Amino acid sequence: MTRALLATVLAVAFAVTALGLRTAVHLRRYGDRGWRVSHSSWSGPAARAHGLLVMAGILLCAAPLAALAISGHPAQPGGVGGVESLASEDTTAATVSLAAGLLLAALGTGVTVVAQLQMGRSWRIGLDPTERTALVTGGLFSVVRNPIYSGMGMFALGQALLVPNLLALAALVLGLAGLEVQVRSVEEPHLLHTHGEAYRRWASTAGRFVPGLGGLRS
């Protein structure tokens, strides 16, 4: 139950800081929420990406809640769908997964928030194909082109380690798939079209999600 409660608190903290607080800060500083979600966001590759990410978000919230719900039913060993199948064992593996999960979730939240701040006025949720924003290449963006998404991936992995059940695993897989579609099929083509050679030069040296991996050929 402790692990599930920690995962629930971390999920709420991530949502409040990365979505609510960031939106409020952006609105206060720039007079704009930064959200670019429209009907066009639900067509083509963007629709696939957003659908996967929405499902991942729902499952990510459901995973610790499901673990909490069944934690009072010891007659169900391992839980429904493997909920807390690892956490219920008093083993070294459980201790390691708890520590790693907490570290990754906290680090993922921190990376996400820092990257959002470094984007400044260019920060967006969604994409308006008619809008041109400044290309941010400093800070975390000097080594990774999508550090916000890297942070989100770390957070999801941390949650899956904290509450190792099928819901958390599905959330991780769907979330990573959604980020891949969003970046490769939606954002990278837009940035190449908008910023051209400047984006290509930067993308040849900065990794896609991990430093040194996924750079574009110049």
Model-derived features with residue positions:
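General alpha-helical segment detector with a strong preference for membrane-spanning helices
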Residues: 112, 149-150
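Membrane-anchoring alpha-helices and their flanking helix-loop junctions
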Residues: 1-130, 134, 158-218
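Active-site-proximal inter-transmembrane loops
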Residues: 126-149
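Hydrophobic, membrane-inserted alpha-helices
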Residues: 151-158
